């Protein structure tokens, strides 16, 4: 087995998947990375297969998807696997980010890993939006029209940029072609960023752990211990995903998208996929178009400032009760935003959306630094009392 350590390619695999020393107290919350990698592989394989039968033209896109569903051998399975794994991908990413926020994975020396992860999240959202347009149902067309129109909020040149993106004066053949090309290419860019994410993690301090202390005191090799641990959650994931694919494949979709796109008829409500709803709610809660767009993008990118705003001395919230409370309030608020994004723009949803948006941004900009300062002060007071 000496070749595993001497061969230039095998030694890389060995360093990352076999001999990689991991803290011995990792919980199952550290399994999301392998699950997300598994999702990306599924998406690339099923996506390339679907692309072999898809026709990116306004007149044939919807029919080609129907052809995949009805005529291609197991085409229904490939398509449902692709669409449901996309939802699973985002669900797991949100859990992965939530775990990172709770356990302080953004703190030095893992700041670069956190930053690359945020870029991956933004690129995932862009890729998902492009893919949602491709079946060219009603929600595809009108979703594409609404979201690309956000670029018109850019002063002076906005409308020109929108028409440049469309390749015409509305969503047309050129739009569908370029969206298909980008949707095909971006997952491979995503895979490259995932490798960078891994390299940044391994070349700094490796994985964190639930205690937030140095993991150097007790480590175990990745194989066989953590490979087996990852396989448990991968098999559980396959079971849950199979239940969705075989028993309720359309539960996370929108019924409007099973109607061929009609530019002359607007759907009753234009709603994106569930995983983009919190940011859609933030966009709609601000009356000004430009400020709404800025707020929506800021809501995604704001997690990058966590290494600066978290002034706590310990990594993670395990031993910080006040921060724990604020974290769970933040999670509840995020779920409220998700629900509000699916509702019509009317009272009281507008007011609730504005309150939730203020709470969302104040969590990162005001609550986190303030609560961490209070906790630091309480610790100092306790230490002074014990010394005296």
UniProtKB/Swiss-Prot annotation:
Highest taxon in the source lineage: Eukaryota
Quaternary state and interactors: Fungal cytochrome b-c1 complex contains 10 subunits; 3 respiratory subunits, 2 core proteins and 5 low-molecular weight proteins. Cytochrome b-c1 complex is a homodimer.
Note: Heme 1 (or BL or b562) is low-potential and absorbs at about 562 nm, and heme 2 (or BH or b566) is high-potential and absorbs at about 566 nm.
Alphabetical list of Pfam families matching this protein: Cytochrom_B_C, Cytochrome_B
Residues that coordinate or bind heme b b566: 96, 197
GO cellular component: mitochondrial inner membrane; respiratory chain complex III
Residue numbers binding a ubiquinone: 202
Claim: Cytoplasm is one of the keywords in the record: no
Keyword Nucleotide-binding found: no
Record's keyword terms, sorted: Electron transport, Heme, Iron, Membrane, Metal-binding, Mitochondrion, Mitochondrion inner membrane, Respiratory chain, Transmembrane, Transmembrane helix, Transport, Ubiquinone
Cofactor dependency: heme b
UniProt cofactor note: Binds 2 heme b groups non-covalently.
Role, per record: Component of the ubiquinol-cytochrome c reductase complex (complex III or cytochrome b-c1 complex) that is part of the mitochondrial respiratory chain. The b-c1 complex mediates electron transfer from ubiquinol to cytochrome c. Contributes to the generation of a proton gradient across the mitochondrial membrane that is then used for ATP synthesis.
Upper taxonomic lineage: Eukaryota, Fungi, Dikarya, Ascomycota, Pezizomycotina
GO terms, biological process: mitochondrial electron transport, ubiquinol to cytochrome c
Membrane topology label: Multi-pass membrane protein
InterPro entries in UniProt: Cyt_b/b6_C, Cyt_b/b6_C_sf, Cyt_b/b6_N, Cytb/b6-like_sf, Cytochrome_b, Cytochrome_b_C_euk/bac, Cytochrome_b_N_euk/bac, Di-haem_cyt_TM
Protein name in UniProt: Cytochrome b
Transmembrane feature ranges: 32-52, 76-98, 113-133, 179-199, 226-246, 290-310, 322-342, 349-369
Family assignment from sequence similarity: Belongs to the cytochrome b family.
GO molecular function: metal ion binding; ubiquinol-cytochrome-c reductase activity
Annotated positions binding heme b b562: 82, 183
Subcellular location, record wording: Mitochondrion inner membrane
CDD domains (UniProt xref): cytochrome_b_C (cd00290), Cytochrome_b_N (cd00284)
